[in-house]
Amino acid sequence: KADYALTGNFSTIAYKEAKKYGEVRCAYDGSSLQFSHIPSQDELCLHSDASYFHYCANNTIYGTEWNYIPETNGVVLVSDMSSDITSRVVDISKYGLIYAGAQKNMAPAGVTIVIIQKDLVMKPLDCTPLMLDYQTMIQKDSMYNTPPCWCIYMLGLTMDWLENKGGVEAM
């Protein structure tokens, strides 16, 4: 079971995809407000039996961004940070999994950053595509297949530049 906050296009897509793998519940649905609003903690309908709570940290299409980290009372927190991962300091210890497509602000399209707690890496469902099997990716040092070398190179240059400028803290 999983809880999802629907606050824009990308969280809605993630919600629909997750339904292919198990029971998914809507913890918040902003569609009636044209996704113009990020819910307060009190507006979230979180379930203690959820395996995780998923939210999209920033909604570029609708111009909304979460300005707080949702409190889940021990339920694993998962976030799509594709468009804002390098815009502020993130306490990754509060998350079970963070993922971010690099194409928004880190590198050309083709690279996805995944930060996952080791204890969450387990045997995937039989229907999980191999490219989404984190256990395989970890065992193969993220090189199960030929990686997008130029994109990774550009990501490295961007991260070096960011570090030389003092990191996210200094930006």
Give residue ranges: language-model regions.
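Conserved PLP-anchoring active-site segment centered on the Schiff-base-forming lysine
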Residues: 1-12
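Short acidic/polar capping segments at secondary-structure boundaries
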Residues: 9-10, 29-33, 57-62, 82-85, ...
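Active-site C-terminal subdomain of aminotransferase-like
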Residues: 102-171
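Structural motif
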Residues: 3, 52-56, 78, 99, ...
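Active-site phosphate-binding strand-loop segment of PLP-dependent enzymes
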Residues: 18, 30-85
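Conserved active-site segment immediately N-terminal to the catalytic lysine
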Residues: 78, 92-103
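Active-site-proximal loop->helix
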Residues: 13-23
